């Protein structure tokens, strides 16, 4: 029931301001001057922005999308030596799930998104844990956020591999 989407890799400032608190990402995003565009930091931003200024009839909901795209961030090395390498690189590919739904259905779909992520990791046979992120760490956009952290035996620690947020009416 999901539509596969290859989202745009650039967004203008107006579109970005409509889908996130730009201050959460602006310091790690690549800006393209003088055009006022940004390379995307994560693919759920353009997936959501694609619906900007659209009037969606309730009968057409939910809209379920999966986006696959390269993402770009300037945060390499910004989080200390233990986060170098694959975890903090300038370009990486992500798969994102986005559901646009009726407000009263958002919590059920949030559970569905989390279940999809857990099913994927279960199918890989990898050990992970689900972390319920405290409100002080989820930023202004999300109402609730879960992370899946996979156990990396070589590193001897869990690392975040999935985030699953309910942004309610942001």
Predicted regions and their residues:
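TRNA-recognition modules of translation machinery and tRNA-sensing kinases, especially anticodon-binding
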Residues: 1-170
């Amino acid at each position: 029931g999901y539509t596969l989407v290859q989202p745009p890799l650039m967004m203008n400032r107006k579109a970005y301001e409509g889908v996130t608190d730009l201050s959460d990402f602006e310091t790690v995003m690549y800006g393209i001057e003088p055009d006022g565009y940004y390379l995307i930091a994560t693919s759920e931003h353009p997936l959501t922005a694609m619906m900007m200024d659209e009037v969606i009839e309730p009968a057409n909901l939910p809209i379920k999308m999966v986006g696959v795209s390269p993402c770009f961030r300037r945060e390499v090395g910004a989080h200390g030596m233990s986060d170098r390498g694959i975890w903090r690189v300038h370009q990486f590919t992500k798969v994102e799930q986005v559901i646009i739904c009726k407000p009263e259905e958002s919590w059920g779909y949030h559970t569905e998104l989390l279940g999809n992520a857990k099913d994927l990791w279960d199918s890989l046979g990898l050990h992970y844990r689900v972390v319920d992120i405290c409100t002080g760490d989820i930023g202004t956009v999300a109402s609730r956020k879960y992370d899946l952290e996979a156990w990396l035996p070589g590193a001897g620690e869990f690392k975040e591999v999935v985030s699953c947020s309910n942004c309610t009416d942001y």
